[in-house]
From Swiss-Prot:
PANTHER family: ATP-DEPENDENT CLP PROTEASE (PTHR11638), HEAT SHOCK PROTEIN 104 (PTHR11638:SF18). This is ATP-dependent Clp protease ATP-binding subunit ClpC. Belongs to the ClpA/ClpB family. ClpC subfamily. It comes from Staphylococcus aureus (strain MW2). One of its GO terms (biological process) is cellular response to heat. Keywords: ATP-binding, Chaperone, Nucleotide-binding, Repeat, Stress response. ATP binds at residues 208-215, 545-552.
């Protein structure tokens, strides 16, 4: 707040406000304390105006104490509430409108009148202050009819009418104090001033990534001119922001655009004190240049070269390269000023400078911790945008969320409102039916409810005023989690239990394979607890083993446990990348090839879902060169697509599956199943597969993988468990047709026996179930047997499968229990 612009009496009002907050043991200085401060200055215009409406200091004190009362003992620094800050800003705005250089008590009173939601506004309402008359009385006391000189600013610029209609005067806006403060850009503003002070080609162009603060530098220059912090050469200059879209708009006939632009140039040259600011400078190229007519850039070139027209441009690096650099004559008329992305420390300082504006707008308190969290989290997790823009957006949206949450009408008030409406309708119906005694009772009930509603509403409002709404780190984390889908909020008890029991959750779908399940679970817990390396993926794994042991199933189970759906993972079938040129499909087709605009199959999916499980299935099937592209993904957690965009893989789990070495094992008659010495078999499988893996893939690729896991062979007991899982899936499908199927243990053992194949793992079980159960059931259904609503028991008598169809009884188990 600009305390230097306050009169001595207004400064004393703020001091009195602080004293009143201390006297009442309040933790913040609010609008009510400002009002009490005004009453403590009886010689001020504000106090005299209020006294003329029979509002005295004693009455104000009584109302304030009645509305919010005394607080608990408070120790610590007092801060202004967002509403109080808003009042100070409004008072400064009132002073500007009345063309006063300083803010007095009268302006603070006008600010309190305009801010109509605080405790002070309720005090005015309770004391029956006529707001319109009070405002008129203040203006009358000043002897200065409001806005009598409405066009005072326009008189300075009446020699540039066309320019004024097409451009915004940033110096006037800066004088009004409505521009956001510019922090930490002194070096760039100084360089702009140096270029503007040249004799010729005095046209700086601000070049930088979107959102780094290029436009803010032009606004900073306007503020520097207003504050008289510029050299003599730039004093009294006007910075005018010209929008090329506005210049082109409405030019229906040929020559109209050129005439309008020439008129603007003539006015600028005659005025001699205008610096033109063109945001999105690349729009000059081609603007208005249809059917052979010259465009805006060619019209401006002569004046820019001679120094008759001072222009500040702003554009991005890509647009500068595409549009400005290709026109060498235009490029040499502008002097580039590089605007880099600010550091994390500088961004924190920028946000602290903007804090007052956002607190006043959202009427909440923004803590230092929230600002630091916004900068750090946006810098880490929002990789396709730039500071400070993304951090400012994060603070703005989180503040909006907190404000809306705290100002939502509570349920008890809504219930009373609905009850009042209901009673009112019943009363009207009773009157219409001429049941006047009942109507009178309902009227009394309505009055009682309305009184109850007012009391509850006042209690809620008092609680709101007493409670300072603050923006916390957790609010910031919630918003960024909503943006990216990455869970960043504090781990609650339910999620903590879920993470600690992740192994059990995965084992519900994946039978056996403890090593793989444990390794994956540990990686997920490390990431969620915030302990993982921030520059690498959550985890990268190679799953080795013969076919059908659960490698792909584990990836699906992990996706389901993390996202609630096993289709949520990004699956890349490497058998589709058997040719060398197919690698372009991962990151996008090169420039000039068909499909360049479509993006890569992998990069586009990860850009849309940065928090995901990526499965590269059957990696040995792909061309060896395909894996070179994954080197930087595994090491640095990012990949650059063909459009030059960096795609962030730091919040992904990368799983690669392979059957490499399986053929050699088969040749050695070790397929990974059966055998009496399980440990010996597993060691043989492990050594063979790791040896083949090293022969098939380069060491720099394998060295970047977090863990290489060789899956165990499946025992007969595990196969029986898998049969039970598959049968349960079948019963769930049949339950949709109202058929209850029960498969006995003997039948399951026989299915496991028939489906047991040492070469193919668990997949033959699917075929065994189809052959033994599904085929026969389908015949029963199609043969006219009415088995819908009945119980079908599948058993094996030692020779063949038997099917017993019976009516369902109340004791019959549900399909899920079968």
């Amino acid at each position: 707040m600009l305390f230097g612009r306050l009169t001595e009496r207004a400064q004393r009002v703020l001091a009195h406000a602080q004293e009143e907050a201390i006297r009442l043991n309040h933790s913040n200085i609010g609008t009510e304390h400002l009002l009490l401060g005004l009453m403590k200055e009886p010689e001020g215009i504000a106090a005299k105006v209020l006294e003329s409406f029979n509002i005295t200091e004693d009455k104000v004190i009584e109302e304030v104490e009645k509305l919010i009362g005394h607080g608990q003992d408070h120790v610590g620094t007092l801060h202004y509430t967002p509403r109080a800050k808003k009042v100070i800003e409004l008072s400064m705005d009132e002073a500007r409108k009345l063309h006063h250089n300083f803010v007095g008590t009268e302006h603070i009173l006008l600010g309190l009148i305009r801010e109509n939601e605080g405790v002070a506004a309720r005090v005015f309402a309770n004391l029956d202050l006529n707001i319109t008359k009070a405002r008129a009385q203040v203006v009358k006391a000043l002897g200065n009819p409001e806005m009598s000189n409405k066009n005072a600013q326009a008189s300075k610029s009446n020699n540039t009418p066309t320019l004024d209609s097409l451009a915004r005067d940033l110096t006037v806006i800066a004088k009004d104090g409505t521009l956001d403060p510019v922090i930490g850009r002194d070096k760039e503003i100084t360089r702009v001033i140096e270029v503007l002070s040249r004799r010729t080609k005095n046209n700086p162009v601000l070049i930088g990534e979107p959102g780094v603060g290029k436009t803010a530098i032009a606004e900073g220059l306007a503020q520097a001119i207003v504050n008289n912090e510029v050299p003599e050469t730039l004093k009294d200059k006007r910075v005018m922001s010209l929008d090329m879209g506005t210049v082109v708009a409405g030019t229906k006939y040929r020559g109209e655009f050129e005439e309008r632009l020439k008129k603007v140039m003539e006015e600028i040259q005659q005025a001699g004190n205008v610096i033109l600011f063109i945001d999105e400078l690349h729009t000059l190229v081609g603007a208005g240049g249809a059917e052979g007519a010259i465009d805006a850039s060619n019209i401006l070139k002569p004046a820019l070269a001679r120094g008759e027209l001072q222009c500040i441009g702003a554009t991005t690096l890509d647009e500068y390269r595409k549009n400005i650099e290709k026109d060498a004559a235009l490029e040499r008329r502008f002097q580039p000023v590089q605007v880099d992305e600010p550091s994390v420390v500088d961004t924190v300082a920028i946000l602290k400078g903007l804090r007052d504006r956002y607190e006043a707008h959202h009427r909440i308190n923004i803590s230092d911790e929230a600002i630091e969290a916004a900068v750090k989290l946006s810098n880490r997790y929002v990789s396709d945008r730039f500071l400070p823009d993304k951090a400012i957006d994060l603070i703005d949206e989180a503040s909006s969320k907190v404000r809306l949450k705290s100002h939502t009408t509570p349920n008890n008030l809504k219930e009373i409102e609905q009850e009042i409406e209901k009673v009112k309708n019943e009363k009207d119906a009773a009157v219409h039916a001429q049941e006047f005694e009942n109507a009178a009772n309902l009227r009394d009930k309505q009055t009682k409810l309305e009184k109850q509603y007012e009391e509850a509403k006042n209690e809620w409002k008092n609680a709101q005023n007493g409670m300072s709404t603050s923006l916390s780190e957790e609010d910031i984390a919630e918003v960024i989690a909503g943006w990216t889908g990455i869970p960043l909020t504090k781990i609650n008890e339910t999620e903590s239990e879920k993470l600690l029991s992740l192994e059990d959750t995965l084992h519900e779908r994946v039978i056996g394979q403890k090593d793989a399940v444990n390794s994956i679970s540990k990686a997920v817990r490390r990431a969620r607890a915030g302990l993982k390396d921030p520059k690498r993926p959550i985890g990268s794994f190679i799953f080795l083993g013969p076919t059908g042991v659960g490698k792909t199933e584990l990836a699906r189970a992990l996706a389901e446990s993390m996202f609630g759906d096993d289709d949520a993972m990004i699956r890349v079938d490497m058998s589709e990348f058997m040719e060398k040129h197919a690698v372009s499909r991962l990151v996008g087709a090169p420039l000039g090839y068909v499909g360049h605009d479509d993006g890569g199959q992998l990069t586009e999916k990860v850009r849309r879902k940065p928090y995901s499980v990526i499965l590269f299935d059957e990696i040995e099937k792909a061309h060896p060169d395909v894996f070179n592209i994954l080197l930087q993904v595994l090491d640095d957690g990012h990949l650059t697509d063909t459009k030059g965009r960096t795609v962030d893989f730091r919040n992904t789990i990368i799983i690669m599956t392979s059957n490499v070495g399986a053929q050699e094992l088969q040749d050695q008659r070790f397929a990974g199943f059966g055998g009496s010495s399980d440990g010996q078999d597993y060691e043989t499988i492990r050594k063979t597969m790791l040896k083949e893996l090293k022969n098939s893939f380069r060491p720099e690729f394998l060295n970047r993988v977090d863990d290489i896991i060789v899956f165990h062979k499946l025992t007969k007991e595990e196969l029986k468990e898998i049969v039970t899982m598959m049968v349960n899936k079948l019963t769930n499908r049949l339950s949709e047709q109202n058929i209850n199927i029960i498969v006995t243990d003997k039948a399951k053992d026989k299915i496991a026996e028939e489906g047991y194949d040492p070469e193919y793992g668990a997949r033959p079980l699917i075929r065994a179930i189809q052959k033994t159960i599904e085929d026969n059931l389908s015949e029963l259904i199609l043969d006219g047997n009415q088995i819908e609503g009945k119980k079908v028991t599948v058993d094996h008598d030692g020779k063949e499968f038997k099917y017993d169809i019976a009516e369902q009884t109340s004791e019959t188990k549900t399909p899920s229990q079968a």
